[in-house]
């Protein structure tokens, strides 16, 4: 097979592989609740992630960080969601290639102490703010 005939085949193969990922979560806006807090325990062996986004989890479950990896877990109600903490989120340079990265928080009120919920390179997480 000539290289010029191979190119269209490779393009079609790539599109066929990526198409299901592109529509993942389409038509769905938001799953209620937030991920439960991680248990303060040491992990001896990390497990392969069960999911990469909420839409890969059945029903109301969300894709959440757990003690030894990322799993589909039952969400909990949002604690004090309206509380906005002082400071600004640090500037993030770059972005991961994951289509729907898991968010470890949605709002400042979900973060402990003075941490803020900020968009990072790969989803939202609780981080130390920079002074405004």
Curated annotation (Swiss-Prot):
Compartments, as annotated in UniProt: Secreted
GO biological process annotation, one example: negative regulation of viral genome replication
Region (Elastase inhibitory domain): 84-132
Keyword Disulfide bond: yes
Domain of life: Eukaryota
UniProt cross-references to SUPFAM superfamilies, sorted A to Z: Elafin-like (SSF57256)
GO cellular component, one term: Golgi apparatus
Induction remarks: Down-regulated in response to low ELANE activity. Up-regulated by ELANE treatment in bone marrow cells.
Domain WAP: 28-76, 82-130
A Pfam family: WAP
Site note Reactive bond for chymotrypsin, trypsin and elastase, residues: 97-98
Disulfide-bond pairs as recorded: 35-64, 43-68, 51-63, 57-72, 89-118, 96-122, 105-117, 111-126
Xref: InterPro entries: Elafin-like_sf, WAP_dom, WAP_four-disulfide_core
Tissue expression notes: Detected in blood plasma. Detected in bone marrow myeloid cells. Detected in airway sputum. Detected in parotid gland secretions. Detected in seminal plasma (at protein level). Detected in uterus cervix.
Principal location class: secreted
Other noteworthy facts: The pathologies of several chronic and acute diseases of the respiratory tract involve an imbalance between the proteases of cells involved in inflammatory responses and the inhibitors of these proteases. The inflammation-mediated release of neutrophil elastase in the lungs of patients whose levels of active alpha-1-antiprotease are compromised by genetic background, cigarette smoking, air pollutants, or a combination of all three can result in severe lung damage and a decreased lifespan.
Subunit (UniProt): Interacts with GRN; interaction protects progranulin from proteolysis.
Official protein name in the record: Antileukoproteinase
Gene giving rise to this polypeptide: SLPI
